């Protein structure tokens, strides 16, 4: 079954993240991700990202890539304005979907938490 999880970003951590990631850096990371490439630590620090934040981002993007490649993550990403994110998980139960979400390093570091969960049937 598929589950839609709507996550709520922590506004203070998001503000810090946006300060540490200029728009052009975020755009480059986003584009690489859309192209199927996970940037490594050297590439991120080369863009001026602190080594601590770069490691969290590498772990986050690697986690999502592994989930996607294994079929556990159907789709996902932040909503405009970084107040929420929407992820669609393939899971045997709601709890398993929650566990997949909470295993994300950004969730572990408190950048976001689950706001709502819905069982979902994909029709189109």
Question: Residue locations for each model-derived region?
Answer:
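Conserved, structured core segments of small domains
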Residues: 1-124
């Amino acid at each position: 079954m598929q589950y839609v999880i709507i996550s709520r970003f922590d506004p203070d951590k998001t503000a810090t993240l946006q300060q540490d990631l200029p728009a052009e850096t975020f755009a480059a990371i986003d584009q690489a991700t859309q192209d199927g490439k996970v940037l490594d630590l050297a590439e991120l620090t080369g863009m001026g990202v602190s080594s601590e934040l770069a490691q969290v981002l590498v772990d986050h993007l690697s986690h999502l890539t592994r989930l996607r490649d294994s079929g556990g993550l159907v789709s996902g990403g932040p909503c405009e304005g970084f107040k929420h994110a929407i992820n669609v998980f393939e899971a045997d139960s709601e709890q398993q979907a929650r566990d997949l979400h909470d295993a994300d390093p950004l969730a572990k570091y408190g950048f976001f938490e689950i706001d709502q969960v819905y069982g979902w049937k994909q029709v189109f």
